[in-house]
Regions:
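Conformational coupling and interaction surfaces
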Residues: 14-17, 33-162
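Active-site glycine-rich loop that binds ribose-phosphate moieties when present
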Residues: 1-28
Length: 162
């Protein structure tokens, strides 16, 4: 995440915090990557109303997946209310990353020189970008900074309906 707080620590998001060294290796590899982080995934949310609507119009072959998503949403919302005091929806973290790989126009990106803090007690897993005129030595990494969240949710749901 560039501008948001973390979701597993004050500064780190789960997919980076679980293995910051691996993430830093990817960032420094020179590969052409786009990071779809909390800056955009927290703004792209699936609601139970979306799943209720899908239940009424999904393809028969998709019924088991939609039923599973409804059950998972109930479980997710219960845990999220307990831990984070959030209610009513589910950020589309990994689904949005996959959708952006297929449809990059869902997001606007910015390139920044970036590294991942691999040590530290409080900042382990934090993505560090250097915006100074002469930034530290690092590769440019593309970060999703804006998202068309309504379009993303519609595109996700369109896979399931007839």
């Amino acid at each position: 995440t560039l501008t948001m707080r973390g979701n597993v620590s004050p500064v780190a998001e789960a997919n980076v915090a679980c293995d910051p060294q691996a993430c830093d290796q990817v960032f420094t590899s020179g590969m052409d990557i786009t990071v779809v982080g909390l800056d955009v995934t927290m703004r792209t949310r699936l609601k139970m109303e979306h799943l209720d609507w899908l239940s009424g119009c999904c393809k028969p072959a998709c019924r088991p997946a939609v039923d599973y998503m409804r059950q998972a949403m109930v479980h997710y919302l219960r845990g999220n209310q307990t831990q984070n005091y959030c209610m009513g929806d589910c950020p589309l973290h990994d689904p949005l990353a996959v959708m952006c790989a297929v449809t990059p126009s869902l997001v606007r990106t910015e390139s920044r020189k970036a590294r991942v803090e691999c040590g530290g007690t409080y900042c382990r897993g934090m993505i560090v970008t250097d915006l100074r005129e002469h930034p530290f030595q690092a590769e440019y990494v593309r970060f999703a900074v804006e998202v068309d969240s309504e379009r993303a949710v519609r595109e996700l749901m369109s896979v399931f309906w007839e």
